[in-house]
Amino acid sequence: MNYIQAIILAIIEGITEFLPVSSTGHMIIASSFFGIAHEDFTKLFTIVIQLGAILSVVVLYFKRFFQTLDFYFKLLVAFIPAVVLGLLFSKKIDALLESPVTVAVSLLVGGIILLKVDDWFNNSSETEITYLKAFKIGLFQCIAMIPGVSRSGASIVGGMSQKLARTSAAEFSFFLAVPTMLGATLKKCYDYYKDGFILTHDQINILIIGNIVAFLVALLAIKTFIGFLSKNGFKVFGYYRIVAGIVLLLIHFFIHPLTLI
């Protein structure tokens, strides 16, 4: 991976991390299109640059992160399912990351679900998140272990299924991203070093640049998304996912197979 490729992936991460379109899925597809080698460092990079994106949440919602202990306990309750299932199925998840077709199908199916959810829970207005709601949202988030599903999309749908207002569901999804992505990054780094890999000077620089770019882009993306969501809902994202999924499948089966090198 070179610096230009790293910046491209970081921009994609910053834009898509908090949108219900799957950042991991988009980075897998981008890697296939741009011929980015799907080596161990690339896998590490796509996880670690999420730190830059989640830092934007801490900056934008700084005061919200220093409220009551109740806030942290609810995040912990929502985070537990991801910890348990992530440890149990991490190897199978890594295998799915090798398949752009999995991403395409997930985009398509997820888009249909997003359209339905936006219709079903269009008038939801609750803002209070109980411990039970937090746990259920955490369960929904685990569905996003399948590439292309979207972590933010799954957790937002989980929130709306609990009658939360769109913006409340989206903001809790942002907050939940912090422990989830931090945990995923720490585990990925541990596995990387456990397997005997050592970062080179260039790789460290690439990670730093990637995180900075992802942070700056995510700042703008979150502000834009919340404003758009409160007025327009999820339909545009649902249609985008459906179109993207169909186009990718057509390309794969009729033009050129989408593969990771």
UniProtKB/Swiss-Prot annotation:
Subcellular locations according to the entry: Cell inner membrane
Annotated GO biological process: cell wall organization; peptidoglycan biosynthetic process; regulation of cell shape; response to antibiotic
Transmembrane segments: 1-21, 41-61, 69-89, 95-115, 129-149, 169-186, 206-226, 241-261
Any GO molecular function: undecaprenyl-diphosphatase activity
Keyword GTP-binding attached: no
GO cellular component labels: plasma membrane
InterPro entries: UppP (IPR003824)
Keyword match Isomerase: no
Main location class: membrane
Class of this enzyme: hydrolase
Pfam families: BacA
Catalysed reactions, semicolon-separated: di-trans,octa-cis-undecaprenyl diphosphate + H2O = di-trans,octa-cis-undecaprenyl phosphate + phosphate + H(+)
Keyword line: Antibiotic resistance, Cell inner membrane, Cell membrane, Cell shape, Cell wall biogenesis/degradation, Hydrolase, Membrane, Peptidoglycan synthesis, Transmembrane, Transmembrane helix
Topology class, membrane: Multi-pass membrane protein
Family membership noted in the UniProt record: Belongs to the UppP family.
NCBIfam families according to UniProt: PRK00281.1-2 (NF001389), PRK00281.1-4 (NF001390), undec_PP_bacA (TIGR00753)
Protein name per Swiss-Prot or TrEMBL: Undecaprenyl-diphosphatase
Protein source organism: Flavobacterium psychrophilum (strain ATCC 49511 / DSM 21280 / CIP 103535 / JIP02/86)
High-level lineage: Bacteria, Pseudomonadati, Bacteroidota, Flavobacteriia, Flavobacteriales
Name of the gene this protein is made from: uppP
